[in-house]
Amino acid sequence: MKQGKKFNYKVEKAAEEALQYLMNKQFDNASEIATKNLKKKHKHPVFLFAKSVDALLQGDETLFRSEFDKLFKLSSVRYTDYHNFGVFFQQHKLDVLAVECFSACVKLKQDFFEGHEQLGNSIFNLGEYESALGAYATALILKPKSKELVISAGKCCTKLGHYSDGLEYYQSLLPDYPFDSNVRTGVASCLISLNRESEAVAFLGKDIDKSYEPEKDYYLLSLVSYNNFKLDSALKFAAKGHELNPDYLPVLKMYGTCLGRLNIHSLAIDILKKAIEKDPNDPEVFYNCGNSFQGIGEIDQAREYYFECLRLNSEYYLAFNNLGFGYSFQGDVGKAKECYGIAIELTPSREDFHSNLLFTILHEEKSSPEDHFREARVWQDKHAIPIDQRVKEYKFNPDEVKKLRIGYISGDFGDHVAVYYWLPVAQQHDRDKYEIFLYSQKPREDDFSKSINVEIDKVCDQRRDVSGLSDEELCEQIVDDQIHILVDLSGHTAGNRLRALSYKPAPIQTSYIGYPATTGLDSMDYYITQPFSVPLEHEDLFSEKLAHIAGCTSYRVRPGAEKIESKELPYKENGFITFANFNRAGKVTSECMRAWGQILQQVPNSKLMLKVNRLDEDDFTNDFYECLDDLGVERGRLILRTRSDFLLYLEEINEFDLGLDPFPYNGASTSLDLFYMGRSFVSLTKGRAFHENIGASLLKFFGQEEMIVSSVEKYIERAVWAANNMEVLEEDRLKLRSFFLTEVAGGGAKVCASLERAMDVMWKRYCDGDKVDHITLDGIER
């Protein structure tokens, strides 16, 4: 309204209605009012603004700009109009336009506090924190006691990395607002950023029961614990915050995330679904929910959440990595490699993604051990530390060492199958001669892990959680611990720290148990194995030198298994033969499926029992059904069982007569579990790779050489032969368990003694300055 012009109540009322419609996103109503009044030549700024918004909604930026610029030429525009226009743009996340409006607002009225405040807010939203701080500073001159402004200024300082200034802003509010959660968490956040974390935690803990919104305080405490890998504490704080306010979104997300990380997946899914209802646009929540579905074996359901995560953020590389895991687990190696490839392309520095790709190659039907070796060397070229950056001096004098320090590093200390191979050996170490250090990369805090960790703690002199250490910090820790021989138990499996080991933090470094192939690293000196698993003539498949030790392997079943009896083969009672494979689907290739289908063809009325992720059909089951259809085998001859706890799984082994080993990646612990339950299996040895010969190695050790074959045709023939000679398998049933208990579960002392002799050879060679070379067994150890 021009200065001096008579106030027109009807026009102002119409303008007020149009503005209200705009704010409520009722754009058609606003446009109708604006058009009607503009025809009457009522050039009120609000009507012109409404027409410019019309152009914006139609995507005509040129027309919008033309109409919008007319506003700034009107002398009748009031500072409140500019403020209202700015608020509209702010609500629609058009902060660039909001800044134009708020700037015009404070130019017309320099002492308009709200204009400076909102100008600062929009500039903040644009990420221009220095300019935002300037706007807030101007507003604070006008209203120095404004709590909201001081908090906003503090946020700007933290965004700029000026944590001391931010702390000063927040602390200035404490005398008047000692229990305001926004003030308290602001103070604590700045303290944390200033490396005064203990002060922050103590500050938040004090008077938390008096805090106005304690869920915010608990959320920050949970976040601190989470970032320090203290997952139990993180869960405790998040749970308390959730109890106090189940609708507070940050704590809801944190609670679900902590539950998932601690393998409490069912509750995690429930909580994260609630978070998604409140915020359907956060890719991280979809990702974490997918992780929990994957954690309970619901791979297809997990995939849906990963896809939704990627819809929201097409470069969310973690989702691609986990999609790769899911496809690999279900046996779709092609899609797994594709997903890992995308993840690696998005983040070339993530060596763990590259390790996942390497592990997947082992499952590939057409790949060779040479393919894996070449890719492992590529991993070294891309991720390992250059030779000139390796540790050059160690903090000990070899001549003064009286007791060897052995370091074991793994991502699997806890309830993981690798531990059940390692623990029977580790329990036999001569503690007078060897000092044992453990480096745990992936804390496992579930109930089963807590139980087994009690045993693990007894076999070591020092155990360190290194999951929060960088590669450089981990290297420094190992050097400071003066480790003489470092034994990696992970290889390229999850949780490995091979990049840290490429620094060569110990003078002797070896790979053992966890990975059935080479690491590909020159910094790893030895690969510890048995001669019939990896003979010397396969040395070209390893960058490491081979260190042969005695026995077959050491492995024990989980507690409670001693109560599970081996029952007679069920073929007599059933009236038909039951074959089985309890390995994960990722090991079952299409060639494998077809061979099993042909066995069913040739053994009338026989059935095949499989472990699957879900009883309703998934991709793996559908592929198997299609294979059976193609062979003319009834689908009903497939018996599906879901994954179960270990003791039930052992009971289920009693329900079949003969195992069928997958190929080319053979079973390992599953095959040993079969022996424990008195079941044998047919195994195909196809090539030179370790993982292609695991089944043959175990069968030889158990005196079951007749079950080893060298072609798919012979694999089928041997299974058919076994079906016709069940009495032979029944005769061996109890012998297999007895041999397992004495030579495998009870073989830890023999294996450990041989391992220690090999370590002594390694140490002597190092002290004498001899080159690293193969270590072979003498006649006695064989």
Please provide the spans of the model-predicted regions.
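Nucleotide-sugar-dependent
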Residues: 493, 661-670, 684-693
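Glycosyltransferase donor-sugar binding loop
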Residues: 440-445, 608-622
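Conserved donor-binding/catalytic loop of nucleotide-activated donor transferases
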Residues: 656, 673-685, 702
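Alpha-helical solenoid repeat scaffolds of the TPR/TPR-like class and their adjacent stem/linker regions
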Residues: 1-576, 594, 629-633, 644-656, ...
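Acidic, glycine-centered active-site loop in nucleotide-sugar glycosyltransferases
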Residues: 678, 694-706
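Short hydrophobic "strand-cap" motifs at the C-terminus of beta-strands
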Residues: 409, 582-584, 611
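Residues at the starts of beta-strands that form the adenosine-phosphate
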Residues: 435, 605-607
